[in-house]
């Protein structure tokens, strides 16, 4: 069995190296439609777009001259590029690997200290330790195995989320200031296999089928309200605050893209793996599945590009999440000229899984506003969320909780950025004695 797997992998590698240069980007992530992990890869390649295209052309010529290569040739060529000749250069190493394997690789590392007020909970006598220190690492890989006019494109996509805390965690901060949401997207330590899929895109790039582990978080949102590492920090503005779907689970989905501006998906997942902490094929035999449908329209107008999407999903009752739910999420994002981007979201879910069962979001962002650095970004947004009284058991709670957040990302070269961030919670749901709560943070990003 081991010999068979080794032979199969060698064959896929060899075949992929012979035919892969036909596309620069995998078509299973449509260019005009938001995909959380694809955006990370796209961001990593923005600075090197010219180099990538020239490398692709050069590779095409090389492959035309050498239609057959040994499976170890990419390793030899990476070493021949000498990425560490003038000191260790992670970017140069990744560029060499990408060129030889027709893959895209990014690693994002974030350090996030956050200070919060009030400092102690309603019935607590001691202040919580400040600040909370969050460390967030997210590697992402997209590898094109093969590409031919008759077989189409086959690719493997991988993304992992690793979150750790030092001194104190965000859950204790949430309790101290009395909010039903969260001061960031991951309140405690997290290990999540967000994506590990094989995708087959058929000729004409209209139909794609994907198998493996994936999460709806990757498509549920727009450019800046769906990723704590690059946009807003607060729970209600960095994701769907009422989401009850899995953080990553095994299943499959079918994607139909009749035109570049239309993307339609339908799929299912194992219902048992709610946290996405493992990759478990056995759960598919236990006859509990979650289902979803998704439609996205990305018009191109004189004002700029936009995206309007709708997601509907249902989850089954399992021991890990003992409530059956139905949820929805409506999103829009629209560029208004070169520098201004407006976005919004309305989402909700039934059941008693989350603290918030409705959320309304409206915001704006301006990328590189003074043409100083491509990483520069200004953002301001507001979210009003309805509190789920069946989940929060305090005797006195507010029905709604509102957060206003603003941030400014300052880029230092292509790989480092700092983001001062301010969150103001108006009428925190679990602190009826407080009119407002405040959270200050500084996000430091290191990306390859």
UniProtKB/Swiss-Prot annotation:
Q: How does it sit in the membrane?
A: Multi-pass membrane protein
The entry's cellular-component GO terms read: cell outer membrane; pore complex
Q: Which UniProt keywords apply?
A: Amino-acid transport, Cell outer membrane, Ion transport, Membrane, Porin, Signal, Transmembrane, Transmembrane beta strand, Transport, Virulence
Localisation: Cell outer membrane
Main localization is membrane
Residue ranges annotated as coiled coil are none
Q: Which GO terms describe its molecular function?
A: porin activity
What does UniProt give as the signal peptide span? 1-24
User: What InterPro entries does UniProt report for this protein, alphabetically?
Assistant: Carb-sel_porin_OprB (IPR007049), OprB_sf (IPR038673)
Q: Which Pfam families does the UniProt record give?
A: OprB
Example GO biological process: monoatomic ion transport
The family line of this record is:
Belongs to the OprB family.
**Job of this protein:** Facilitates L-arginine uptake, as part of the AaxABC system. The arginine uptake by the bacterium in the macrophage may be a virulence factor against the host innate immune response.
Name listed for the protein in its UniProt record? Porin AaxA
Q: Which organism is it from?
A: Chlamydia abortus (strain DSM 27085 / S26/3) (Chlamydophila abortus)
Upper classification of the source organism reads: Bacteria, Pseudomonadati, Chlamydiota, Chlamydiia, Chlamydiales
Primary gene name: aaxA
């Amino acid at each position: 069995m081991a010999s068979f797997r080794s032979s199969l992998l060698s064959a896929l590698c060899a075949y992929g190296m012979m035919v892969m240069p036909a596309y620069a980007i995998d078509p299973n992530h449509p260019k005009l439609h938001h995909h959380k992990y694809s955006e990370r890869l796209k961001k990593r390649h923005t600075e090197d777009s010219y180099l990538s295209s020239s490398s692709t052309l050069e590779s095409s010529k090389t492959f035309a001259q050498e239609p057959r290569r040994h499976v170890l040739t990419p390793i030899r060529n990476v070493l021949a590029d000498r990425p560490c000749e003038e000191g260790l250069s992670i970017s140069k190493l990744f560029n060499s690997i990408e060129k030889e394997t027709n893959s895209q690789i990014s690693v994002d590392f974030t350090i996030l200290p956050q200070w919060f007020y009030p400092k102690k909970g309603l019935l607590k006598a001691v202040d919580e330790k400040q600040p909370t220190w969050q460390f967030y690492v997210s590697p992402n890989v997209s590898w094109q195995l093969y590409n031919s006019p008759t077989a189409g494109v086959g690719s493997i996509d991988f993304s992992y989320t690793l979150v750790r805390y030092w001194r104190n965690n965000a859950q204790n901060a949430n309790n101290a200031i009395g909010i039903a949401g969260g001061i960031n997207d991951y309140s405690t330590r997290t290990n999540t296999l967000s994506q590990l899929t094989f995708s087959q895109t058929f000729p004409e790039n209209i139909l794609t089928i994907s198998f493996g582990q994936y999460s709806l978080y990757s498509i549920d949102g727009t450019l800046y309200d769906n990723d704590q590492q690059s946009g807003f920090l607060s729970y209600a503005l960095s994701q769907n605050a009422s989401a009850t779907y899995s953080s990553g689970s095994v299943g499959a989905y079918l994607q139909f893209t009749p035109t570049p501006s239309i993307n339609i998906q339908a799929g299912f997942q194992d219902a048992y793996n709610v946290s996405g902490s493992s990759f478990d094929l056995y759960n598919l035999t236990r006859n509990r599945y979650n289902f979803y449908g998704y439609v996205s329209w990305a018009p191109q107008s004189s004002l700029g590009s936009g995206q309007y999407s709708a997601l509907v999903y249902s989850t089954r009752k399992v021991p890990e999440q003992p409530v059956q739910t139905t949820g929805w999420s409506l999103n829009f994002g629209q560029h208004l000229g070169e520098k201004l981007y407006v976005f919004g979201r309305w989402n909700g879910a039934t059941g008693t899984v989350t603290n918030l069962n409705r959320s309304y979001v409206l915001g704006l962002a301006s990328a590189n506003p003074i043409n100083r650095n491509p990483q520069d970004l200004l953002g301001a947004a507001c979210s009003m969320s309805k509190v789920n009284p069946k989940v929060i058991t305090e005797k006195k709670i507010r029905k709604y909780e509102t957060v206003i957040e603003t941030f400014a990302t300052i880029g230092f070269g292509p790989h480092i950025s700092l983001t001062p961030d301010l969150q103001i919670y108006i009428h925190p749901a679990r602190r009826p004695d407080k009119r407002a709560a405040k959270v200050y943070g500084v996000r430091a990003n290191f990306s390859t």
